[in-house]
Amino acid sequence: MSYSNILVAVAVTPESQQLLAKAVSIARPVKGHISLITLASDPEMYNQLAAPMLEDLRNVMQEETQSFLDKLIQDAGYPVDKTFIAYGELSEHILEVCRKHHFDLVICGNHNHSFFSRASCSAKRVITSSEVDVLLVPLTGD
């Protein structure tokens, strides 16, 4: 089976390169499309900050996340069609994006670091609720 529209769940960590490389290896032979989804930290968890500072912090976190995605894409050696930056529960966003954009494969990482522990938990929810195939990739740290 070949996949032509792949969604990759990445984190702002070096291990995300492994996930994107896996997506490229699947998409390249069929000239498939790749998109990325990630979580941005929500500054509201720092509720002791004043409201104006929260908005500034949210903007900074959004910019840093986008910069990471831009660098990841630049290093991929394959075009990435879309990026999605989500807040909140990753699995809900993955399922919603899959429905709206007709992805046929979701790639997630399995790692012990905090994001990937959450992502692995999210992957479990995606696997049980997804209408498309899900590939869980074991990640190794550098």
From Swiss-Prot:
Top-level lineage group: Bacteria
Name of one Pfam family that matches: Usp
Keyword flag Signal: no
SUPFAM superfamilies associated with the record: Adenine nucleotide alpha hydrolases-like
Single GO cellular component term: cytoplasm
Keywords noted in UniProt: Cytoplasm
Protein's cellular compartments: Cytoplasm
Main location: cytoplasm
InterPro entries assigned: Rossmann-like_a/b/a_fold, Universal_stress_UspA, UspA
The keyword Amino-acid biosynthesis appears for this protein: no
Function: Required for resistance to DNA-damaging agents.
Family: Belongs to the universal stress protein A family.
PANTHER family registered for this protein in UniProt: STRESS RESPONSE PROTEIN NHAX, UNIVERSAL STRESS PROTEIN C
Identification of the protein by name: Universal stress protein C
Organism: Escherichia coli O6:H1 (strain CFT073 / ATCC 700928 / UPEC)
Gene name in the database record: uspC
